Amino acid sequence: MWIGVGGHFEENESPDECLLREVKEETGLTLTSYKMRGILTFIYRDICEYVCLYTADGFEGEMTSCNEGELKWVPKDKLLTLNLFEGDLIFFKLLLEDAPFFSLKLTYDQVNEHRLIDANLNGKKLELFDILDENGVPTGLTRERSLCHLLDTPHRTGHVWIVRPVKANNKIASDTQADTSQNKPAYELLLQKRSHDKDSFPDCYDISSAGHVPAGSSVLDSAIRELSEELGIKASPSDLIPIGTHEGNSHSIFYGKPFHNHEFSTLYLYTKPVKIKDLVLQESEIQSAKWFDLNQLMEDVKNNAPGYCLY
């Protein structure tokens, strides 16, 4: 594992004094320009440590060998490819983004010391996902949400498709919102329009209800929760009909940044009656909901029509 230089405070030392001494002892260098960037709280094996996090861009002297490990200069754009603790990946990403001074709390599992079980940034809980192997099986490790999409990390999602049949006269209980073909068996899918502020595919129509599976949670529980949070639908486990799994991997650019989405998705159907006027939409995630004719929707997808979340 790779870590930065540093160590424990000696008696009566200030953070700056500890920094200067440790860097000198471990590298032989004398820092001439440095800045405190954040405070880290590490919890592991019933131990709580507070770490003052610095970066330095000025030094003098010649680098010496270190009796505590190997010293190596690493290009900034390669930092996140190193073998690092998952919590370290979080604060390295913050440093690379030149984030303002931050407080990051990281809690590791007492048995598996490499498994990050909780992360809080400036008092706000961060989302952690189970890291999957090539077969979609959890490895026992977790990773923060934005890092999963930055580093192309496979993770789990649950997808719920809300479907309804169209009656012969093309009228559906005063809630018709899609044109249908009279020559084909007709079904409609309910799609949600993603909010303008989403980090991927803003303003595009997407699955009826979908979401990531938090680390340690089941896909079914997550799918039920997302239905409630996004659409206000209170479903029971028996209401969701499992129809399969799907592995998807897309590579896009959003807001000038790479966005990789490697998902192992469990798919469900929800066939109970749904009226758009009765939905309670999660405004931070969804602009609106609309019924789409399934046959026309399939044609749009085949033709890669704009306005949909396709990958």
What residue spans do the PLM features occupy?
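Nudix hydrolase/Nudix homology domain
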Residues: 66-126, 140, 203, 244-311
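Hydrophobic pocket-lining residues within nucleotide cofactor-binding pockets
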Residues: 9, 40, 58-59, 63, ...
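Residue-level signal for short segments within beta-strands and strand-turn junctions
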Residues: 58, 133, 162-164, 193, ...
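Active-site segment of metal-dependent pyrophosphate-handling enzymes
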Residues: 28-62, 76, 196-197, 228-276
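Intrinsically disordered, low-complexity terminal tails and inter-domain linkers enriched
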Residues: 166-186
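Conserved Nudix-box catalytic region and its N-terminal flanking loop in Nudix hydrolases
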Residues: 1-25, 39-41, 110, 114-123, ...
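Residue-level signal for well-ordered, solvent-exposed loop/turn and beta-edge residues enriched
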Residues: 1, 35, 135-137, 141, ...
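Acidic, metal-coordinating catalytic segment for phosphate/diphosphate chemistry
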Residues: 124-167
